[in-house]
Amino acid sequence: KMQNVPKAERQQRVLEAAKLLGLEDFLNRKPKALSGGQRQRVAMGRAIVRNPQVFLMDEPLSNLDAKLRVQTRTQIAALQQRLGVTTVYVTHDQVEAMTMGDRVAVMSDGVLQQVDSPLALYDTPKNLFVAGFIGSPAMNLIDGTVVDGGVQVGDYVVPVAREVLDKAPNETTLTLGIRPESFSLGEEGIGLDVAVVEELGADAYLYGTLTGADHADVEDASRQIVARISSRRPPQHGEQVRLVIDPSNVHVFSQETTERIS
């Protein structure tokens, strides 16, 4: 109305947006009579009727409960695909970023860390911050000592190519990044003292600490190791197991620069 848009066109735009958002039956209701998800769709409708070239959404789901957040997230993603409008979506929830974004920009303290597709961020994180931020559960970040042939973690040497080690010639310790699903149970590998087992049917998550870790490591959640195991008979609390690692799935990070060098 303030833009001198004719009344008939205003009504048409409102009806089109309401139909798109599934709000036709709520046009005569006051905001206080709407649910949280419906109010969120009304806010989107206000933007749609302006025919924008770009949407900017700043934490749009932060006030919704978990179930409604998932439902609204899928609605926003479907709507964006239908409209084909470039959308800049700001969020602290990495699940929202990974599931909704075509490209994701990861920032820390206002500094851009990496811009890439969700899969590239997951598979090839640029540094320790991105590695620890993307993924749920997060990537395991394990400190180890540089030795001949790789990096020693506990009593096991994780194979690392010489050309990778040569990229950090002055460092005696490096950080290994390993996704929970990159582990499997075997006879040789990193020793794990199992503290908690989460059985999910076909899979199970093992939470524990490196075998031989001191008391401080056991109490420190940041030192915890998480492994996703495909087994209907997973190890139990208190057991010691060996986690086998495919060297091709190991990320190596410099502790001086925090950059990935593998």
Each model region followed by its residue ranges:
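Generic, ordered loop/turn and secondary-structure boundary motif
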Residues: Q3, L27-N28, R69, T99, ...
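N-terminal hydrophobic alpha-helix used for membrane targeting or insertion
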Residues: A17, V85, G132, D220-A221, ...
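C-terminal boundary and immediately downstream tail of ABC-type ATPase nucleotide-binding domains
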Residues: T124-V147
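Non-catalytic connector elements of ABC transporters
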Residues: P137-M139, G150-S262
